[in-house]
Amino acid sequence: MINFLTYIEAVWLNRSSRFKGMLLKLYLLMHGCKVGKGLKCASFPYFKGFPNKNIFIGNYVDLGRNNTFELSENGKIIFDDYVLLHQNILISCNNQIRIGKFSAVAENVSIRDGNHQFSKNQYYRLQDSISEPIEIGEDAGIAAGCVVLMGAKISKGAFIGSNSVITRKTIIEEYGIYAGNPLKLIATRK
């Protein structure tokens, strides 16, 4: 009996996620964004800044709960096919953030392509932002609690361990497994 109830719950959650995905797709299409087929979302993402022809979602993308997308006027978010975003993910985009096909991002991850300047001649909060695009290659994985900062490039097939910080200075090899802060190569996918 328990297995049957678990099955019913899984079917309901899947249908609910697909329905919410259809509603999100309609919302994004109304704002000029491009969305492929099969979008699923466990809950609607929170948008800081309205989507305006600047979100591109491929086929069969799966969004978890409580995700936040901060978009500047010039920011562009691109999710290729079969991207999986778990829950509580913050994506703050001033320039461009691209997540390649078949990539996955675990819970509590922060991805930010911008930062303030740090001049002593002006108050910190009044300074302009600087930004560099972030590229997460296909078949990559980012584990829970990671922080991906501006200019980061995560190569194809790479995996980043929990609570790691990825910066533009970090060179990440294809299919490498990295962890720590500072980030270090600990193994290679075989």
Placement of each model-derived feature along the sequence:
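Conserved catalytic-core motifs of eukaryotic protein kinase domains, centered on the activation segment
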Residues: 115-116, 121-122, 170-171, 189
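Flexible glycine-rich beta->alpha loop in the catalytic core of nucleotide-sugar glycosyltransferases
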Residues: 109, 116, 153, 164-165, ...
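A generic "structured core" feature
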Residues: 147-149, 155, 159, 165-167
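Alpha-helix termini
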Residues: 71-72, 129, 164
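Domain-scale signature associated with acetyltransferase and cell-envelope carbohydrate enzymes
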Residues: 1-112, 133-139, 146-148, 156, ...
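Glycine-rich NAD(P)-binding loop of Rossmann-like domains
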Residues: 123-137
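Flexible, gly/pro- and Lys/Arg-enriched active-site loops
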Residues: 114-115, 127
